[in-house]
Regions:
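Surface-exposed repetitive/solenoidal architectures
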Residues: 1-299
């Protein structure tokens, strides 16, 4: 049972999913996962809690995860996001981690958290069954999400993500490991990060591109509204269709790199401001990367 009154001086202290749901859904509350727990793992494997069919609302002012890991959760709700913030007030979520998360919510993105900042959080081992949404995050036209020092390791399954990875979410110092399909219509463009910034980010994994009709489908990494900055993309891009696909990084405000060895046949890649295409070997050479303006510190 949760303790505390939910104020900044006396936050709610929680250690169960039910108490987390109640406390985090309380507008303006301050919430902490139990900092003194002997174990900080909430393992739902075999639990009667699964499948979870109700989204997890994060409407509190602050949720401090204190390193807690929520594992083996199965979320099944075809018409809702997994984590949602419905408040326009600023919400801070930090150091909370989800492992082995299965989401069957194909009409919605994993997160919908406008006005929320995630710091030091992770979503790993995520299997996402998607068909009609952004893969990861959706802010709003008036309030954007922010992710700092976060990790996203996700596998999307389905006919193809039609909208991209995220919209209206700024990522700084984040790591992505993605395995996903992405579908674009012939003669039109699809955008992986729409109205979203990528600064000091690393993206790895594989994206299987598919063009539905002749007419040169176009895939934009960003749309230029918020260009990349000092980001590194080592993603295996493949073309699973018979039609040519154009890959456009658009532009960056500071040197960003794309590993060209990982771009498959049937994909034509284009230049952009401050974009450097590098070989796999060059991408591992700190001296070379520094020489082209991509800052790397050897350790």
């Amino acid at each position: 049972m949760a303790t505390g009154t939910g104020t900044q001086a006396d936050p709610y202290i929680v250690s169960t999913l039910a108490d987390l749901r109640t406390a985090a859904g309380t507008a303006g509350a301050y919430v902490e996962m139990d900092p003194d727990a002997s174990t900080k793992i909430l393992d739902l494997n075999g639990s009667a809690t699964n499948p979870v069919t109700d989204r997890l609302d994060i409407n509190c002012a602050s949720l401090e995860g204190n390193g807690w890991r929520i594992r083996n959760l199965y979320f099944s709700s075809p018409s809702d996001h997994f984590l949602v913030s419905t408040t326009t007030a600023a919400t801070q979520v930090s150091d909370l981690h989800f492992d082995n998360l299965v989401c069957s919510n194909g009409a919605k993105s994993l997160l919908s958290m406008a006005s929320t900042t995630l710091t030091g959080c992770s979503f790993t081992g995520v299997k996402y069954f998607a068909a009609g949404a952004y893969l990861l995050a959706a802010g709003s036209s008036t309030h954007s999400m922010t992710c700092k020092f976060c990790t996203f390791a996700m596998q999307a399954q389905g006919s193809g993500i039609p909208y991209g990875i995220a919209t209206r979410c700024d990522f700084t110092d984040c790591n992505f490991m993605l395995d996903m399909p992405f579908t674009v219509a012939g003669g039109s463009r699809g955008i992986l990060f729409s109205y979203s910034g990528l600064e000091d980010c690393l993206m790895r994994g594989s994206i299987a591109l598919h063009c539905t009709a002749n007419g040169n489908g176009l895939v934009y990494i960003t749309d230029g509204n918020k260009p990349m900055k000092n980001s590194f993309i080592a993603v295996e891009f493949t073309n699973t269709s018979e039609y040519t696909i154009g890959l456009y990084p658009v532009k960056a405000t500071a040197t960003s790199c794309i590993v060209k060895d990982l771009i498959g046949s049937g994909i034509t890649y284009y230049n952009g401001d401050n974009i450097q295409y590098v070989t796999a070997a060059q991408g591992k050479d700190a001296a070379y990367l520094n020489s082209i303006g991509f800052p790397v510190t050897e350790v």
